[in-house]
Amino acid sequence: MLVITNRNISKGFASSGIGDETAFGEQLNTDDPNEDHIANAQKTKGKWVVELVKEPKNLTSDNLPSRAQFEHVLQRCKDNKKNCLFFVHGYNKPFEETLEQGWKLQTRYNLEVVLFSWPSNTGGFPIEEYKNVKRVARTSTGAIDSSF
């Protein structure tokens, strides 16, 4: 499953590029909330493996990781005669839960899922958290727009 997110990246995951359901946190990307991270997620024997897609030092229109990853998704759709679903989750979803929801959709409906995961579970007193998440959702529009 292809994962696109503007969540903050955990330190260990950033350096190794290999992680699990804790690879991304519950806050906005600290570098830039409109900057997406791209990863591939696979659930094997009940365990998540999340692999960060590294960017080349010199990005050009010919070597964009997002383009290459989406081309892989489209090829899998063609090869396996599957449809593709771009899934954006709702409010109050930790990263692990968004992975689970995307995975269930993918397996239940035999689809290729591209998951956009945004920090919708920032914590705190419920009313204040809701207001904060509303601001985060507005801020995330640039990130989701760039993923399209």
Q: For each predicted feature, which ranges?
A:
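Flexible, membrane-associating and regulatory peripheral segments of lipid-active enzymes
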Residues: M1-V114, G123-E128, N132-R135, T139, ...
